[in-house]
Amino acid sequence: MMKKKPKCQIARTKPSVENVIPYNQFKKTQPRFNGNFSALNNEEYIILFGGGRDLILGSLTPCSSSHLSNQANPQDTSEYGTDLFILNSCIIIWFNGLGYGLEIPYSSVLYHASRRLPDGREGLQLEILLTLERDEVLDMLYQSLAPQACEFDGEEAHAFTVRSVELTIRPKYSIYDRHYNNEIETLFTFENFGVNRGDDLVNNCNEALAVCMDLHGEDVQDQDQEQYQDPSMAFEGAQDLNATYSGLGDTLHGPPVYQNDGLADDLDGDLVMDNVVSRGGPEASMSMEFYANQNLAGRKNSRDNE
């Protein structure tokens, strides 16, 4: 049965120390956790990987006034300071002063990066660029302006075009600005995220987005296969999977070992083995797990010296 693709939702509960736990604190309270991130891709733990407060939300996509359809008066979310929470389950952009937020599944994220500000100052030269696939909720919050008609435009030209909205998230304060919160900070503390202002905040968020996006990489692949794969091409699809670059996913979902492959007996420098059997490809290897702060030493011996 085809799974329904998650879409953006309106969040009514703001993440706090009562319902989420920062990643560094999670590692301290879970001694059984050994760095295998695959255990974090479930609903048992809501873990905070990154984010920040006092952010300025903008949009690069031409949009009309942002509002919810069930509100009588349109309200621009950019007028209010926003908080960003990058969780293992989703992304939440919380609109302070409005009492709600935007919950974004990772399957809706098309692109994320850091963008240099043309008018930046020292310690505040970057902002987060987040490209999202449009859905009903994003259409309510960011109503796209109708494109101008063109004689070359047609239904075929837009058949495979993904409708998207580009958001910018800019820190309000630089790394070097002296700022005191009105309330005691319990989530984005120095112990958990460092200074987490200005450019440091942008870099921290991009790293957190990369980790969490890779956590949900398999979910996106499964949805794409169920939606687009032709049953008659199942065998060809299985062959293609063997040639797919998995990126960081193998490291996050598997044990911390070196991944390698090859033929077994090549330690004797045999030219026949090298040129005929392996043909210059990967040769003998083994999977080894190294623990932290341990010195490593090794030697490769030929058969004549054994």
UniProtKB/Swiss-Prot annotation:
Pfam families: Voldacs. It is found in: Cytoplasm; Nucleus. InterPro entries: ICln/Lot5/Saf5. GO terms for cellular component: cytoplasm; cytosol; nucleus; pICln-Sm protein complex; spliceosomal complex. GO terms for biological process: mRNA cis splicing, via spliceosome; spliceosomal snRNP assembly. The keyword Nucleus applies. Its main location: cytoplasm. It comes from the Eukaryota. Induction: By cold. Keywords: Cytoplasm, Nucleus. Present with 5930 molecules/cell in log phase SD medium. Belongs to the LOT5 family. This is Protein LOT5. The gene is LOT5.
